[in-house]
Amino acid sequence: MTSTRRHPATMPRVAVIYHSRRGTMLRLAVAAAEGAAARGARVRLLRVVDDGPGPSQRRRHAAVDTEHSVASPEDVRWADGLVLATPTYFGNVSAPFKRFLDSTARLWARGLLADRVVTAMTSAECDYGGREATLLSLYQTAWHWGSWVLGADLTDPGHARASSNPYGLSVNYRSEEQESALDVDTARAQGARLAEFAARTPRPRCLSSPRPMRGPARVTVVHHALHDTVRVMAQECAAGARELGAEVRLRRVPDGATVPGGARSTVKGPPSALPATKRDLEWADAVVFGSLARLGAPAAPLVDFLQQLPEGAGPLTDKAASSFVVTPQPHAGSESALLAIHHLLFHGGAVVAPPGYTDPASFAAGGNPYGSAHALSHGALPSPAALEAVRYQGQRAAVVGDLLRRTDRAPCRLPVSGTREDPHIEHTRRTDRTHHIAGKATS
């Protein structure tokens, strides 16, 4: 893998943060760091302090856990992209890693962790044992930060052979003697891909003076058409994207998505939008999905629509995506239905980028980091706060989609809400953290 040379001011900054007790996660983290460095990133390879294992375990892996500097919340602030690597314990992240994540709360409260791109890796004793749950748990923290989450590369044949986990890399515990070259190569590729996406994250200098391009960002808003409340929120989401100069397609998934041509809503109101098709997703740079929540899950017609898309790489691959919901009660799917949609989006290769807490509108509407939500128990139509939140979600979809796309069209006019520090300030910070990755000094 050849290195990509960049000016230091434009090099993406990647932090690979790991917890390892048997060496498996350490080896994957080193490989991910090598991959990111080869893509021109400045890399920090950092460990989480382990104060949990018993004496025998301490002796076993004390050596491997002292060769890299200890991660701090400031490393999350420094990074444009993060690889989070933890073993699976009881279907969740390890306790030391969870303590590290919790330690970022003060920076999160100041709005300093938004708009990073995050991916994750894990390992377990057996083929299942909670690997998926661990990766998804890590991503919930990332969404609270306001990050974009990058799952597995569904176009990489090596990933399919290594774990076939759409949420990230998950492997079996292995001793150094049993190390799988395929696992290591896949981790290296995941680090390289993370660096490529980290290079597209916003910094003040590039958002304040965008370069001219050929045309506006494209946003498709797809909603379940049965209920007026969902339709109104979809219209507001589309309006938010248009405010930033995006081209928008507002599309519906009728109740009974497999009916040819689709059935129109039977409720009163303006005419329904055109039926959604695969081409509407292929056209878009970003997609927002809206649905009723039924029994804590997204409505079956929307799930049906998504499940008819090609498995693996398809029209959502590498595109920004998020969702909003309407629920019967405040806690009858306002989070679980959104997370379920996110899980579906990973299977399509999307970059899942919900609002998080990147704008006051999210707090005013109830503080749901996973997407906008309205409970029908609060009124038949969305509240002003819910409308403002979903309008902002449309704006955010346009901006993130604009940053992620590879084609040259005009960027949206307004930056993502949230504070990003001057990237030049951190370049001289803690120079003792320099590590050597793949024969190159990276910090």
Walk through the language-model features, giving the residues of each.
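Short, glycine-/small-residue-rich phosphate/pyrophosphate-handling segment
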Residues: 114-162, 320-365
